[in-house]
């Protein structure tokens, strides 16, 4: 489901403009008339998702010009899902967020719109998106997936769901907040380390030292994490550190 009708029409014609999925593979699983028992059905009609019992939200979480997280795509998605939510349904979020967004920000929206109670009538899970765009070797099924659920039973359901898809396996986190935090730091770590190497590269250049040779020498130690100078960008890595320093502190929540 997507609100972008142009995107839906394109996928139904068997083409993915991002080139993450080849046309042949897409066409082999596509269900354009919703007649298959198993297949990919893409639509922009909210009515078509009413019969679903598991909803997976994969929308972006950008930042504004003040580097504050913009949760609007997640909020709108939660409102749409809340309007069709049924007893026993599970809502799984994959968007990168600061710890607490799923349970403290999205759950109240689901409850308000659906009129149902969290962990009694419906449940939630969180499994951070792990993809490497443009990488044909480390595809989505070959990257280990972190999973979590709002109760131990739901955590197991979510974990088994992803295990049926992810060849590389899964890691079941003890809570949704742990899974949320894990995603933020894995991206932030890359941003920080690459930025650090970039600064060192500037210093070494002024000193007439070859950075590549320095990294090669340092890399002879078993626990040295090797990062090369380069660009840090994309829609996630450069943004995710902002999620950490803008997340509400425990003191803020008490007040």
What kind of region is each of these model predictions?
Residues 3-54, 61-67, 112-114:
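Conserved N-terminal Rossmann-fold NAD(P) cofactor-binding segment
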Residues 55, 244:
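Conserved, function-defining core regions and hallmark residues within catalytic/recognition domains
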Residues 56-57, 93:
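Redox-cofactor binding/interface segments in oxidoreductases and associated redox assembly factors
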Residues 63-130:
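Rossmann-like NAD(P)(H) cofactor-binding subdomain of soluble oxidoreductases
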Residues 108-224:
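Internal alpha-helical scaffold of NAD(P)-dependent oxidoreductase catalytic cores
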Residues 237-241:
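A structural motif shared across PLP-dependent enzymes of the aminotransferase-like
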Residues 245-252:
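Conserved small/polar residues in nucleotide/adenosyl-binding loops
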